[in-house]
Design a protein with these regions (language model features):
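Phospho-regulated, low-complexity intrinsically disordered regions of nuclear gene-regulatory
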Residues: 2-25, 57-65, 69-131
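Short amphipathic alpha-helical elements of helix-turn-helix/winged-helix folds
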Residues: 22-30, 42
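Short capping segments at the starts of secondary-structure elements
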Residues: 28-35, 48
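Secondary-structure transition/capping residues
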Residues: 34, 50-54, 117
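A short acidic, leucine-rich amphipathic alpha-helix
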Residues: 38-40
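Residue-identity detector for threonine
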Residues: 42-45, 96
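Short, positively charged loop/turn segments that connect secondary-structure elements
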Residues: 44-64
Length: 131
């Protein structure tokens, strides 16, 4: 992880480059940890901010499992199955928790990313941020 370069954040020629970056954006916005449904919700919002239409969002969401697997293989992301609470159920729910291996470094690399800044301003309400 120490040798992580900006190239890993920019994506690669493997076909998932921009989706990998979108996952990293979502993980940074979620402070390095995300339950699977929260990650997918954040990705949908990112894609909406980027102007993707419904069909593009469906195509992208179908590729996300492969993208997550690839990021885990690169040791940028890890996951584990855990129990979490769910207000609609009386029992805990087993779900997947994703974690960035080096959240601080990736956050620094994406600190001036226009999509991250726009999300923080428009969705999270951080009005003091400038583009």
């Amino acid at each position: 992880m120490e040798n992580m370069s900006p190239k890993l954040v920019e994506g690669d020629e493997g076909g998932f480059g921009e989706l990998e970056v979108d996952v990293l954006r979502a993980m940074v916005l979620l402070h390095g940890y995300a339950w699977k449904p929260d990650l997918h919700d954040t990705l949908s919002t990112i894609w909406r901010l980027k102007g993707l239409d419904f069909n593009q969002m469906v195509e992208a969401s179908e590729l996300i499992p492969k993208v997550l697997e690839k990021l885990c293989q690169k040791r940028i992301l890890r996951f584990e199955r855990r129990l979490r609470g769910d207000l609609s159920r009386s029992e805990p729910l087993e779900d997947t928790l994703y974690c960035l291996e080096n959240e601080r470094k990736i956050s620094e690399m994406l600190s001036s990313d226009p999509i991250v800044l726009r999300y923080r301003k428009e969705i999270m309400g951080y009005d003091s941020l400038k583009f």
